[in-house]
Amino acid sequence: MLAEKAIGGTEYQKLYDMLSQFLGKKIYAFMPIEAGGVNSMLPIAAAARLGMPMVDVDGMGRAFPELQMVTFTIGGMKATPMALTDEKGNSCIFETITNKWTEELARAVTMSCGASVSVSLYAMSGKQMKEYGVRGIVTRSEQLGKAIRTIKDCGNRTPEEHFLEMSEGFKLFKGKIADVLRETRAGFNFGKVVLEGIGEYKGHSAYVEFQNENLTATVDGEILATTPDLISLVDTETFIPVTTDALKYGKRVMVVGLKCFHLWRTEKGLELVGPRYFGVDTDYIPLEERCKGGN
């Protein structure tokens, strides 16, 4: 969407003013709500524009498609008040009875505003952030980015071995994209990417289901990974992640699983982001157990 509908540039100051006035308190710092996609980068721009610090923490340790899907919800924190504005200057503040309602109302407004808005939410104390935030996630993202940029400088290891070591990932499959099925419903991108095995996986098949983010990875009919563990498709040569909107026929990818933040494996965490929440008829089993040691 941002390729067609860019950020205006005044949203950061407007959100800061709206939320601080509503709270009657000074806001001391920003943080990204998730470590994936543009939502990991905009808080950096906001902090730079307003001359304020950004904390090295987020609420997911990855990306999830809905606003209530954060570790702060596990801790009982409210998403609201939530300030919302678009690039035209339309704005509002929501107070909702649950974080799920925050998601529902924000998505409805977002679709009316052209499928892209800027929001500020989950105001909290430093103590709450320390207790429930995923610490060091920005630094971790920088480290992974550096590992990908220097993938050819890996000594006596192959680039693939270097990538898996740096990411602490489990290699689930390697294949060529044979088909991509997509459908847009209720403001989400649903779909499935089908893979034909290459290399050591030749003769095997796999598919990955997604709702904005990848939800399950299935190889030869056996589920090898599910949400909340992270499932990533990376280019087999550059090892740059391939987002769901960039999937296309013929592209060669490696399917990699990464362990999620420990709070997602609790009962409350799985209620929010476990496979059954997304309609997947399977119980959550940790990635490392499904892979029996993995790669």
Predicted regions and their residues:
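A structural-propensity feature for long, helix-poor, extended segments
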Residues: 69-109
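C-terminal non-catalytic interaction/assembly regions of soluble proteins
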Residues: 180-295
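Flexible, glycine/charged-enriched surface loops at secondary-structure junctions
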Residues: 113-126, 154-174, 262-268
